[in-house]
Amino acid sequence: MKKNLYKYLAGNDYPGRGIVLGKSPDGQKAFVAYWIMGRSANSRNRVFEPIDGGIRTVAADPAKLEDPHLIIYNAVLTLRETTVVTNGDQTDTIARFMNGNLFPGYSFEAALATRTYEDDAPNFTPRISGVVDMRRGGYKLSIVKSDEGNAESVQRQTFDYPQPVAGEGHFISTYVKNGAPIPSFTGEPLRVAIDTNDADKFADKLWASLNEDNKVSLFVRSIELETGEYEDIILNKYTACLLYTSPS
């Protein structure tokens, strides 16, 4: 049974970072959503910034950045006909493996086999990642996490959806809910309804569902499967303090 993603998020004040991959009800588009949340001032001091083919996280106010470790990274990259989305610098690891075609058909899994969970004890935040075929619409999701907080045991799980159904998607997040330490996501990605063909409406509903205090930024990509062309939407809670330099 498909879950109502908006209700699920509205009832959870801190699922952490989240990825949704799926297909529009008319079957013509693939949707990619990624958001970040934060409880600390350092985690909240971020915005999504567009780059060629994707986004990266940057400090909203560089003067207030305490520690870039784990919070500043490329979150979305486009590799020919593949969108890569992750919650950390494993985006670059996946891109390197896929660009080199090091393990044909399994470069995603092979790349993540070289990575482990984040070193933020006692939470040991999972690394969540996804890839989308921008012409066929198939996708994969992965989570790399500790064994319920046991730093001596890493678990790597990949979920493959080569034939997604129209109006359906899958959702994975770093955490189950708030806590101390924060419990990692468990089980398979949640099967959720994609209820609109309109990316703007999808983004607006997701943004409204995320906890007002803890949400930081949201990214939504709509991909036309017939052509592979895409449009990106970025919503930031905080305004970036941009540093301009004069031309040389």
Label each region the model flagged.
Residues Q90-A151:
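Short histidine
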Residues Y244-S248:
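Conserved small/polar residues in nucleotide/adenosyl-binding loops
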Residues G16-S24, A30-A33, N74-V76, R127-D133, ...:
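Short beta-strand scaffold segments in enzyme catalytic cores
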Residues W35, S40-E81, T91-D92, F97:
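Conserved loop->alpha-helix
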Residues M1-S24:
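Short, extreme N-terminal leader segments that mark the start of a protein/domain
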Residues V84-N87:
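Active-site-proximal beta-strand elements of phosphoester/diester hydrolases
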Residues M1-L5, L102-D119, T196-A208:
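Charged, amphipathic alpha-helical segments
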Residues F124-R127, V132, G138-L243:
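A two-mode feature
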